[in-house]
Structures are given as C-alpha cells and as structure tokens.
Amino acid sequence: MAPKKKVTGLIKLQIKAGAANPAPPIGPALGQHGVNIMEFCKAYNAQTESQRGNVIPVEITVYEDRTFTFILKTPPAAELIKKAAGVAKGSGTPHTVKVAKLTMDQVREIAEQKQADLNANDIDAAAKIIAGTARSMGITVEA
C-alpha cells in the first residue's frame, strides 16, 4: 500500500452542476491552496453533467503535493424543496406568510434522495428533518 499523503486543506463549495469555471468563488478558494483550478473544473463538470441545473455541494481534500480528491454530496435540502414546491425562494417571514404546500409523499421522496448525507437512521427521521427545513422556509407540509 502506498504511503498516506499529508492533507493540507479541506474546501467545501456549493457549485451548480456542470457549471464550474475558474471565476470567483471557485478560483480564489482553490488558488490559495495551490490546486490546479482548470483540472478541478473539468473533473467536477464531467462528474456532474447528468445533474445539470442542481446545486451540488463538493468537499475537496487538498494534499501536500498539491493533488486533490473530491467528494460530491447530494443537493441541499432547501434546493430540493424549492424545486418540489415550484417556488423560486422561501418566505421572508416563514411563520406568518406561507408560500407553498408539500405533501408528505414529496417530503419522503426528498428524504430518500438526501438519506446518505442526513444524520438520520431511517426514512421517517430523515422526513422529519426535511419537513422541518420546509417549515423554516415558509412551506407547509400536509400529512
């Protein structure tokens, strides 16, 4: 087994799928760690091509020799909720002004998609987390 490389940095970014380019905010974030920005952009765009339109969080691990690896996460819950509810953004005053409604089936569907990244043991717990996020955005969840 090859010797372990020393990690020098961990960068977390949220980038639109298939739309990574060296312009800010990506360029400066990677540049200060000495990563080849174009190489990352090409690799990220190739891996997220099928998910165009979504925002995909990525965790980039930078090593001492300036190489990097990255892990793609699932889209943020808020983005998935907005897409399912068909709204552009959540409510400015979530507890007084409701902007949309979601059914429990839609919430469960989002929970299944997010299950890997959520701190939940089963789908019911994951659905509760998603429902809470929806409520905080001014979207009512119907049972």
Swiss-Prot record:
Any one Gene Ontology BP term: translation
A GO molecular-function annotation: large ribosomal subunit rRNA binding
Record keyword Zinc present: no
Pfam family, one: Ribosomal_L11
Modifications the protein undergoes after translation, according to the UniProt entry: One or more lysine residues are methylated.
Keyword tags: Methylation, Ribonucleoprotein, Ribosomal protein, RNA-binding, rRNA-binding
Keyword Protease: no
Matches recorded under NCBIfam families: L11_bact
Function: Forms part of the ribosomal stalk which helps the ribosome interact with GTP-bound translation factors.
Subunit text: Part of the ribosomal stalk of the 50S ribosomal subunit. Interacts with L10 and the large rRNA to form the base of the stalk. L10 forms an elongated spine to which L12 dimers bind in a sequential fashion forming a multimeric L10(L12)X complex.
Family (UniProt): Belongs to the universal ribosomal protein uL11 family.
Full protein name: Large ribosomal subunit protein uL11
Organism: Clavibacter sepedonicus (Clavibacter michiganensis subsp. sepedonicus)
Gene name of the record: rplK
